[in-house]
Amino acid sequence: MQTSVALRFRRMTRKSYGAFNTMHRIINIGTLTSLALACAYTSTVSAQNVAASEPEYNLGEPDKELTGVTVTASKTATPLNEATRLVTVISAREIAQTPARSIQELLNYVAGIDVAQRGAQGVQADVSIRGGSHEQIVILLNGINVSSSKSGHLSFDFPINLSDIERIEVLRGPSALIYGTGAFSGAINIITKHSAETSLYAKATAGMHRLMGAELRGAMTWGKTENSLSLSRRSSAGYRTNTDYEIYNALWQTRLNLPAENKMDLQLGYNEKKFGANSFYSAKYPNQYEHTQRMIASLRGDLGGERLRLLPTIYWDREYDCFELVRGTTFGQNHHIVNNYGAGLIANYSSLLGTTTLGGELRYEEVIGNKLGTPRAKPESYYTKFGSRTNVSLSLEHTVKLDKWLISAGTLMSHNTLLSGKYTFLPSVSVNYHPLDRWSFVATWSRSMRLPTLNDLWYTDPVHKHGDNLQPEYAHSFEAIAKYQTSHVEAHLSYFLMKGSNLIDWVKFDRTETAFTSHNIAELTNQGLEAGLALRLGEYLPFLGDAGRLSLDYLYMTQQHRAPGVAMSKYALNYLRHKFTAQLAHNVGSRIEALWALRYQDRVNQASPFATLDLKLDYRLTNHLRAGLELNNITDTQYADIAGVPQPGFWLSGSISYSL
């Protein structure tokens, strides 16, 4: 139950979410749906599908210790430290502290995530988890799948501002049973703010390279509904030739509160991007350009009683993409419109025998354009081709608690019309052993599958060529986790192993070839270690202030593969061998809060190792007015995440915000 703005919980809440404020806490949830736990600092937790409505965090207010937390989610509720998944939660408070200007930049501070940026400030980046590709993760907005079925390059083209976010939850590792076949190596769920407590928020930003931005969000309660509207525009002239951009966002949300703590959530959104894409997809063409639009609409319910909960969902999103291989010309130009329609239902039943969950989803995808699909009988303008597919999935899962053990097992059955007559079963088993209050040990095994994207199946241009008879990719994954947690210290160590077959990649069979071809790699194995440590320092080092904390995160990974005939790989064989992140937060006097963020990464096969240092200063002018200063890449390091696409050097920006 929430007892203060600082979110101290002392007993179970019967709502469909459990929010809590802590530092690198480990939350215990046996099964997951769409993960939702609010914490004041990055936390490693297990979570389930949740949507929260907490007020904005006060950066100057210390976090409170949580006692006896139980999180009630859409599938099951379990006490603290009995997690069967490893989930990193980035809270609203940490989002406000970090020197990030986009979700992609924010995710760069998590060691287990590889953010290969093409354009800065959230223009475009390939985000992957534990050596997987950017096509192998699912992106969700309030539990609704917003991943691009066309290409993972576009999966973050949806309407969201950092100030809209309550928390971001990163599930590391396969999660097909929870999110479907797209969650091959993990999932990222963005939970937005629903509370109308902050009725007005406005922010203006300016900086180097003619950076300009404006945000406006309003919220109000009307009858039984909570409503909010968020608008924004960001632009820059670019940090080098042909890297200019404009980004527009609009997001409307309504929550209808029904009797017995039932609710319905509606969200409508629009995103538009126009940007120079200097060497984004090929160094041979530095003057590329792209214009994308995304519209989303969804309705989600949380209904039922104490024993039986129902979560119906219906959604639609529309992607528009215009790409020019040479800006301002028709050479290599392509136009596409993609529609994704989906409907699903989760039924969750709790009894003395445990918790049983039955789920089902129907998803239809269609594309019309001049590159993807097969020729239309009646072509129109650019839209000469059409393609479609339908996916049906059913899942069954049961979770039981036996003394200090939490055991969960289930399977997902999937059928896609591109694989006529074939049914794929993806089982998963998780075990959590919690011998002592401060310790827990977890082991999981699962099977996963991913279908080719629309680009994988059909895309061809002068430097890319789709392969014939492309097949789904499969993997078996295992993970072992050890976690230790007190009120001031949290640590975790995990080992992961993924053995994949038929992995999809864009490759060359001879280095002299001009085009990459989409192709199934025979075998690929990723394995590695992740370690994290978080310390709350304010009480022990008072000079750091209430904000004092230190967090360290490290990833080490190796890869073995068998890819007969492959001379060059564009994605699958280019992975992070090492990634280390460190964050130190502290107060400067009574009104200023500072956060230093260090990142080091060493990538195999493409870019050279590098390190960057960022700083964010937040100055509380009044209770309603704040000023911020962001210094990104203070050392002016010259680096690239993708060979041939250099990233910005030192970039200074400032902002002022008002909230009511």
Spans of model-derived segments:
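Gram-negative outer-membrane beta-barrel transporters
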Residues: 401, 405-407, 496-499, 519-603
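Short acidic/polar hinge/loop motifs at secondary-structure boundaries
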Residues: 126, 145-172, 191-193, 252
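Flexible loop and strand-edge segments within Gram-negative outer membrane beta-barrel domains
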Residues: 236-243, 247, 261-340, 464
